[in-house]
Regions:
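Noncatalytic alpha-helical scaffold of FAD-dependent oxidoreductases
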Residues: 2-448
Length: 448
């Protein structure tokens, strides 16, 4: 997408006082995702400024999808007919200090919310590796950070408002709706248009992060649980070569009375002497501060700074979740494929996520370890490697990240979600004519 994207709207595009219509997208503009690997199947794009406008637009379309921050690498958010943007619905609506919740428009980005919360003395429990993503999109796909005691980002959701296919507004909350709420939080875009989200918050806190280099894989095999439990959030970066983890990122909360001195060694890895990028050859200028320098939670939990592009964007991503109890076996299984993986890989990241109770979450009722791959943008090669990885991870019933690339057969994927039959019934209840279904959902949830 050109720098003058649809997000930078001029007043000349306003069709009426009530609706900002972008249907006359210029013919030479191709609507793509952030990475540039996916060209969306339509350029028809309308914009809503209010809940009432969302209702009007939804009722008027036979088929539609919401276009968010476009950080998914597959077609989960694609449409062949019509997009709606909520970019002008990006406000923090209220902060309840007593209840410790914040309510926001669903299109708000984590980075923007974080600065607001910190200024008010509050924080979120966790963030993803980059803060440029929308809250609605991240929760819908069970996007996560790391930490053995940290659930994915959706676990902070206390309530949500969504517009159903008939234009009805439905509000669900953890306190009042129980299983119906847990069914809908990770909704994959298949239930309606989420317009408002309430998140749990906690008192703000400071963090520091240290990076260690060259952790022997043998140490990881012997001490995986101890390594992953050694800080509030831990990330392991590896290229699967030389029998080692290239970098270990330890993100710890600053606690009163706790020493800030870092050990020179960590399970055989050496303390870094300068800030590093997860891919060591790249500049760390766009990464969050390291070297034990204390700072706000939102400037340490992500790997990348809000004000910088996390990378060139020309990449592909895949990720697989396995039960935490099988972590070492799964890592060794992937390592056996190193000669197939490495020619196409930029870097892999290994993270931990606590269990949750959301029907379509990869971490449903299981504490998980996620093995992530950032690939060079060569889909022809990557799609040959993914089946090899999926075969090696099959004994652990690995579940792919909903917003990243995978090649699992639909029936295999479906078998790994025990609540899928009930979720499909819920989709039929909320959206009887399939207004919010698309090719991705049709294939992966309903395909044979």
């Amino acid at each position: 997408v050109k720098k003058r994207t649809f997000l930078k709207l001029s007043s000349s595009l306003l069709a009426t006082p009530s609706l900002s219509t972008l249907a006359n997208w210029m013919a030479d503009e191709k609507l793509k995702n952030w990475a540039g690997n996916l060209q969306y199947s339509t350029t028809r794009l309308d914009q809503a400024k209010s809940l009432q406008q969302v209702q009007k637009l939804v009722k008027g379309y036979e088929k539609m999808k919401v276009l968010g921050t476009r950080h998914c690498f597959n077609g989960i958010a694609d449409s062949t007919t019509q997009f709606v943007s909520l970019v002008e619905m990006s406000q923090v609506l209220s902060l309840d200090a007593k209840a410790k919740t914040v309510t926001v428009d669903a299109n708000v980005k984590y980075g923007d919310l974080a600065t607001y919360l910190d200024a008010k003395g509050f924080a979120l429990h966790n963030l993803a590796s980059l803060p440029h993503i929308s809250i609605a999109g991240a929760c819908a796909t069970a996007t996560h950070g790391s930490g053995v005691k940290n659930g994915n980002l959706a676990t902070a959701v206390a309530a949500m408002e969504l517009v159903l296919a008939n234009g009805e507004v439905r509000t669900l909350s953890r306190a009042k709706d129980g299983e119906a709420f847990r069914a809908a939080v990770v909704h994959l875009g298949g239930l309606g248009v989420v317009t408002k989200i309430t998140l749990d918050v906690q008192p703000t806190f400071q963090m520091r992060q240290y990076v260690y280099e060259n952790l022997p894989m043998a140490q990881l095999k012997e001490h995986f649980d101890a390594i992953e439990s050694s800080a509030y959030s831990v990330s392991l970066f590896t290229d699967w070569q030389k029998n080692r983890v290239n970098e270990v990122w330890l993100k710890e909360r600053v606690e009163k009375g706790k020493t800030a001195a870092a050990k020179p060694e960590f399970y055989g890895a050496k303390l870094a002497t300068k800030n590093l990028h997860p891919i060591a050859e790249l500049s760390a200028v766009n990464c969050t501060a390291q070297m034990g320098v204390a700072g706000p939670w939102y400037e340490r939990l992500p790997h990348f700074r809000m004000g910088f592009t996390p990378s060139s964007g020309k990449e592909l991503q895949s990720e697989y979740f396995v039960p935490a109890r099988n972590a070492v076996e799964a890592i060794l299984a992937v390592e056996r494929l190193r000669d197939h993986i490495s020619p196409h890989l930029m870097i892999s990241e290994i993270r931990t996520i606590d269990a949750d109770s959301f029907w379509m979450s990869p971490c449903y009722k299981q504490a998980s370890v996620a093995i992530h791959f950032t690939w060079k943008q060569d889909w022809a090669s990557v799609k040959k490697v993914l089946p090899m990885i999926e075969k090696e991870l099959a004994p652990f019933k690995a579940r792919p990240h909903w917003g990243k690339l995978f090649t699992l057969a639909p029936v295999t994927l479906q078998s790994r979600y025990e609540k899928l039959p009930e979720f499909k019934k819920l989709m039929a209840d909320y959206d009887p004519k399939g207004k919010f279904r698309n090719a991705f959902l049709d294939m992966n949830l309903f395909g044979k």
